């Protein structure tokens, strides 16, 4: 973790607060249909249709309909996954702004277009497979908060891509000049103090989680990762050890931390990671979280940092994705999904550290 010299010199603030509510959405398999259509060399259209008999509002964030460069699809070539070079957003599903939702009447559809070359290197050209599946939080009828989550699996596309044309598509993530100087500019004053405290909490969480993963209660590990395989437990412990080391490295490390929204993708989010550049960005909502929680599974500053560092392959490879948020949704994942889900690690770390 590389931070500014002014940040290193400051002492962290400490605090206690009650846990925030976490996601307890019921999940179902019907109500929304998602279709993918190729509309250009690297451009794709997504169409979502409300198949229910009532009005429904779906969350756009972290889905195919998010205007931010989040992972919308999975791209593969010759059986190998193409690395994702966009961002991973972390948000509080219970406090989303109105613009996070799109409302659909029964039978109505919504469309979104995006360029897959903005977040993946497709310059090799040739045949690529494009797929999308996951869960979308929804509000059934009138309401202000999601009432359930609907699983979907879109059709798989096979696209013959011109590599030269794809290479000319601009990346969705702009280059930042003098990145360490930007860090000096964003992590100052109270931001610096709070971040230092968050990093210390992160280190504590990760150290305790590493111990619990390698030699702790097997049932507790099973609760979050759906397996008790000893080799898997050791691998999870190694990820936590790497996170603990990164959280303890104030003037060195593999990531760069920004305390303000240098890329402009914070709308509705608490924090986000740019894994391809090893950048972690705190949003304004991050600073409103309690610095430290002593009970429960809600997010505090250290919890969010653990979550974000699991996304960074420079800390531990491969980096994780966001299959689900919160205890109830994460509990529905299978073993493979759980081991690749950022919030599963934060929840496990919080549980073994606080409870």
From Swiss-Prot:
Signal peptide annotation: 1-19
GO molecular function: metal ion binding; metalloendopeptidase activity
Reactions accelerated catalytically: Preferential cleavage of bonds with hydrophobic residues in P1'. Also 3-Asn-|-Gln-4 and 8-Gly-|-Ser-9 bonds in insulin B chain
Disulfide feature: 187-259, 266-283
GO cellular component, one term: extracellular region
Gene Ontology BP term (one): proteolysis
The organism of origin for this protein: Coccidioides posadasii (strain C735) (Valley fever fungus)
Pfam families associated with the record: Peptidase_M35
Full protein name: Neutral protease 2 homolog MEP6
Catalytic EC class: hydrolase
Propiece residue ranges: 20-179
Statement: the UniProt record of this protein carries the keyword Metal-binding: yes
Principal subcellular localization: secreted
Gene: MEP6
């Amino acid at each position: 973790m590389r931070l500014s010299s002014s940040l290193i010199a400051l002492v962290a603030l400490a605090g206690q607060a009650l846990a925030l509510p976490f996601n307890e959405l019921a999940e179902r398999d019907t109500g929304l249909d998602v279709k993918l259509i190729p509309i250009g060399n690297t451009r794709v259209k997504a169409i979502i249709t409300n198949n229910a008999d009532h009005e429904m509002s779906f969350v756009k964030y972290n889905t195919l309909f998010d205007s931010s460069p989040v992972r919308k699809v999975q791209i593969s070539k010759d059986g190998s996954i193409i690395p994702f070079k966009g961002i991973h957003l972390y948000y509080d599903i219970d406090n989303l702004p109105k613009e996070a939702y799109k409302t659909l009447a029964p039978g109505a559809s919504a469309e979104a277009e995006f360029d897959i070359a903005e977040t993946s290197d497709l310059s090799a050209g040739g045949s690529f497979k494009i797929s999308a599946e996951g869960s979308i939080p929804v509000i059934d009828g009138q309401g202000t908060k999601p009432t359930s989550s609907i699983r979907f699996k879109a059709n798989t596309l096979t696209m013959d891509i011109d590599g030269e044309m794809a290479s000319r598509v601009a990346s969705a993530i702009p280059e930042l000049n003098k990145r360490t100087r930007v860090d000096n500019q964003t992590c100052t004053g109270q931001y610096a103090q709070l971040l230092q405290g968050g990093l210390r909490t992160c280190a504590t969480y990760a150290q305790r989680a590493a111990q619990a993963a390698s030699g702790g209660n097997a049932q507790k590990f099973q609760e979050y990762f759906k397996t008790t395989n000893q080799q898997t437990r050791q691998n999870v412990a190694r990820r936590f050890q790497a996170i603990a080391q990164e959280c303890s490295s104030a003037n060195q490390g593999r990531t760069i931390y920004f305390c303000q929204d240098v890329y402009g993708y914070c709308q509705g989010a608490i924090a986000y990671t740019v894994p391809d550049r090893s950048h972690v960005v705190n949003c304004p909502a991050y600073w409103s979280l309690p610095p430290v929680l002593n009970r429960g599974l809600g997010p505090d500053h250290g919890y969010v940092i653990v979550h974000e560092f699991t996304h960074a392959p420079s800390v531990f490879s491969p980096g994780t994705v966001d299959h689900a948020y919160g205890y109830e949704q994460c509990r529905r994942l299978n073993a493979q999904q759980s081991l690749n889900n950022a919030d599963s690690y934060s929840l496990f770390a919080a549980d073994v550290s606080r409870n």
